[in-house]
C-alpha cells in the first residue's frame, strides 16, 4: 500500500482573508514569484485551525495541536499557481522542529482556542512578540458545508496544491499539498487583528472575509529545488 510521506489532518478550520495592495505585497515576497489577484486585489490569509493528527508514512506522530499559518497567493516563474507562507505559530513541538523541512518559518508565539462567551461559540487567539495579533470569534452555521464553485473567490483561496519557498543564497523550492476539495460552510464571525502589522506585512485595504471548514486531510510531499519540478 502506498503511503504519503506526511499526512496532516486538520479540523475546525477558520480562514481569515484580508485584501491588500498588490504592489505593496509584491515587495514582501521573493522576486521570482508574482502576486496573483482576485477581485482586483491581492490577498493575505491567516488560517486558524486544530491539527487533529499527523502521520509520516502511516506512523502517527504527536498530539492534537492548535496552529496558525499566514500565507498569500502567487504564481511561479512558469505561471504555476501556488502559495507562499509568511510564517506559522503552533503548540506542537514536532511541527516546530520540522519547520525548515517544510519551508515554514515557525515563530515564537501563543495560539489558543476556547469556548467563547457572548454571541459566538468559539474564540481563537494568536499572540506574537508579546502582542495580541489576532482574535477570531465565530459560530458555524447550521447548513451543511459544500465545495466551492470553480472559479469562485472561495475556490481561489482554498483549492491550491503547490507551495513555493525560498532558501539560503536565493535558492528556490517547490512542494505539493494534495487534498480533497475543501468543504466550506456558513459562519458568523468577528475579527480583531493587528497581525499584518506585527508581521511587517502590508496593511489591509478593506474588511476581512472569513470562511469556515469542518476539516480536511492534507498529503504533504517533501520540498524540492524548483529546477527539478
Report each predicted region and the residues it spans.
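Internal, well-folded beta-alpha domain core
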Residues: 14, 69-229
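A short, surface-exposed helix-loop junction/capping segment
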Residues: 1-10
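Glycine/small-residue-rich interface belts in oligomeric ring/scaffold proteins
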Residues: 6, 22-70
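A short N-terminal beta->alpha junction/helix N-cap motif
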Residues: 9-17
Amino acid at each position: 500500500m502506498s503511503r504519503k510521506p506526511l499526512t496532516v489532518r486538520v479540523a475546525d478550520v477558520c480562514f481569515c482573508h484580508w485584501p491588500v495592495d498588490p504592489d505593496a505585497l509584491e515587495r514582501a515576497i521573493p522576486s521570482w514569484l508574482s502576486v496573483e489577484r482576485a477581485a482586483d486585489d491581492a490577498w493575505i490569509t491567516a488560517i486558524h485551525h486544530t491539527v487533529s493528527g499527523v502521520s509520516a508514512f502511516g506512523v502517527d506522530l504527536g498530539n492534537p495541536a492548535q496552529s496558525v499559518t499566514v500565507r498569500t497567493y502567487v504564481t511561479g516563474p512558469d505561471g504555476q499557481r501556488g502559495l507562499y507562507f509568511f510564517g506559522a505559530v503552533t503548540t506542537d513541538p514536532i511541527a516546530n522542529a520540522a519547520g525548515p523541512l517544510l519551508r515554514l518559518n515557525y515563530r515564537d508565539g501563543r495560539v489558543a482556542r476556547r469556548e467563547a462567551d457572548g454571541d459566538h461559540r468559539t474564540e481563537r487567539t494568536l499572540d506574537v512578540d508579546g502582542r495580541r495579533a489576532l482574535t477570531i470569534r465565530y459560530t458555524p452555521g447550521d447548513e451543511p458545508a459544500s465545495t466551492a464553485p470553480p472559479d469562485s473567490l472561495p475556490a481561489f483561496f482554498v483549492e491550491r496544491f503547490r507551495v513555493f519557498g525560498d532558501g539560503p543564497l536565493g535558492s528556490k523550492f517547490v512542494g505539493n499539498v494534495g487534498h480533497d476539495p475543501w468543504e466550506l460552510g456558513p459562519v458568523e464571525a468577528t475579527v480583531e487583528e493587528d497581525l499584518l502589522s506585527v508581521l511587517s506585512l502590508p496593511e489591509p485595504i478593506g474588511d476581512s472575509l472569513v470562511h469556515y471548514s469542518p476539516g480536511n486531510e492534507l498529503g504533504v510531499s517533501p520540498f524540492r529545488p524548483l529546477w527539478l519540478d
